[in-house]
Regions:
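Short, charged/polar connector segments at secondary-structure boundaries
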Residues: 1-47, 53-67
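Short, proline-centered helix/strand-breaking motifs
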Residues: 9-11, 134, 158, 176
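Short beta->alpha linker loops
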Residues: 28-29, 50, 72, 128
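Alpha-helical elements of the RecA-like P-loop NTPase motor core of helicases
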Residues: 32, 135, 163
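A short linear boundary/processing microfeature
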Residues: 39-40, 48, 83, 130, ...
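Alpha-helical interaction elements
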Residues: 65-157
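A short, Lys/Arg-enriched interface patch at domain edges and termini
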Residues: 156-177
Length: 179
């Protein structure tokens, strides 16, 4: 309703799309609201950035939302970490990287993320662990049916073991109602 009356106050952030037009980096919801309000134009800021920088920008924008699900935070942290690991690399010039070098780069990236996000390195790594959960269990975390700490522990199980856990939980719930 306010968008209908005064328009979009905060500009969308976009970058040029190589195939023509623009890619929205921040402001998808504002654009949708503007379209629903019948607006034909919205203010934008055009930024030049490569794919990794765009991913980091989008993730940072999403993480600033107030109501973000644990799964959204988990995948956002994982995406940002992957993009940070790629930044500044030229794959055509890179020699074979050792697992030790990869581990050091990962720790450096997590430390930088920790500073930027105001979240401990351990907590960031624990959120990223949630991306190893099967979708059914991850949904239960988002719905607050499984708490964060037990979910992190479940993430260390193989997908088949997670399914067995889920079946055991369903059975226990069903037998509880039968008694």
């Amino acid at each position: 309703e306010s968008i209908k009356q005064i328009g979009v106050v905060s500009p969308l952030i976009v970058r040029p799309d190589p195939e023509g037009g623009f890619e929205i980096l921040s402001g998808h919801r504002r654009l949708h609201a503007a379209q629903l309000a019948g607006l034909e134009t919205v203010p934008v800021i055009v930024k030049e950035m490569d794919d990794d920088a765009a991913i980091i920008f989008m993730v940072d924008s999403n993480l600033q939302r107030e109501n973000i699900l644990p799964s959204e935070r988990a995948f956002s942290y994982k995406m940002k970490l992957e993009a940070m690991k790629h930044q500044g690399e030229r794959s055509d010039l890179q020699p074979e990287t050792t697992s030790r070098q990869l581990g050091e780069k990962l720790q450096t990236s997590v430390a930088v993320m920790s500073e930027e996000m105001g979240e401990s390195q351990r907590q960031i790594q624990r959120f990223i662990r949630l991306t190893n959960l099967i979708p059914e269990i991850l949904d239960m975390v988002d719905e607050k049916k499984i708490a964060f700490n037990p979910a992190v522990e479940l993430s260390y199980l193989k997908p088949s073991e997670q399914k067995e856990f889920l079946e055991a939980m369903d059975y226990a719930q069903a037998s509880h109602y039968l008694s």
